[in-house]
A protein has these predicted regions:
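Dual-mode signal for accessory low-complexity, basic/Gly-rich regions
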Residues: 43, 83-208
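Internal alpha/beta scaffold segment
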Residues: 1-68, 72, 89, 128
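Short capping/connector residues at structural and topological boundaries
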Residues: 48, 62-69, 73, 78, ...
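Preference for short coil/turn "hinge" residues that link or interrupt alpha-helices
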Residues: 10, 36, 54-57, 73, ...
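Extended active-site and interfacial segments that coordinate phosphate-rich ligands
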Residues: 12-19, 67-77, 135-148
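Short, Lys/Arg-enriched charge-dense amphipathic segments
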Residues: 1, 60-79, 117-118, 197-207
Length: 208
């Protein structure tokens, strides 16, 4: 949704149309667009407390998952080289493959015909698996070959707190709806760059 030079965005995906909540998503996008068009402010470069909405987290997470590939791991070009079975995230975060989760639109098999099974990739922040193709799996004796088609990021509180609750407890910060054109700056340490999109707001005293 566009209002002047500002845009707003919201989305949902589910197998059941009754779970899409189209009116709620539409109103959320409209509110963001209108709010973004109201007295925009410019902030100087610096370090800020940042709250990422789920879509923004997903954009960054997709790059992390991409970098879990075994080939670059064994070549030493992965940001996770020599970090298997070590903590790479906050201990309150875990990453699972959950193909049966109703909200993830999972499938029973991959595009290569491999079975998709429930599996653990990061538990309590500790990386315990890599993404193998058939070649690296055979080379390193990986069987069965697990995949990460339906990633589910689980967070314990306060990581799992709702966005509205995070906003209320933030004295000064930035709320990011989404990212666009995310690109790697340095793949070896997973430094990324990108642009915020569809609603970036200043938070002061717990309010946008």
């Amino acid at each position: 949704v566009q209002a002047g030079e500002a845009t707003g965005w919201s989305a949902a995906a589910h197998r059941s149309i009754d779970r899409l909540h189209v009116q709620e998503r539409t109103l959320a996008a409209i509110i963001k667009a209108k709010r973004g068009a109201d007295e925009p402010r410019e902030l100087p470069p610096g370090r800020y407390t940042v709250i990422l909405e789920p879509a923004a987290v997903a954009g960054l997470l997709s790059w992390m998952i991409w970098m879990l590939d075994a080939k670059s791991f064994y070549k030493g070009t992965s940001p996770f080289s020599r970090k298997l079975n070590t903590r790479i995230l906050d201990r309150r975060l875990s990453l699972f493959n959950q193909p049966a989760h109703a909200d993830l639109l999972g499938h029973g098999f991959t595009s290569e015909g491999l079975p998709v099974i429930e599996s653990s990739w990061i538990e309590a922040g500790v990386l315990n698996q890599l993404l193998h193709d058939r070649f690296t799996a055979q080379e390193h004796g990986i069987d069965p070959l697990t995949t990460l088609e339906s990633p589910y990021l689980s967070g314990e509180r306060p990581v799992g707190t709702r966005v509205d609750d995070l906003i209320r407890t933030t004295q000064r910060g930035i709320l990011v709806t989404n990212f666009w054109y995310i690109r790697p700056v340095n793949p070896s340490d997973l430094t990324l760059t990108g642009m915020t999109r569809d609603g970036t707001f200043l938070i002061e005293n717990g309010e946008i």
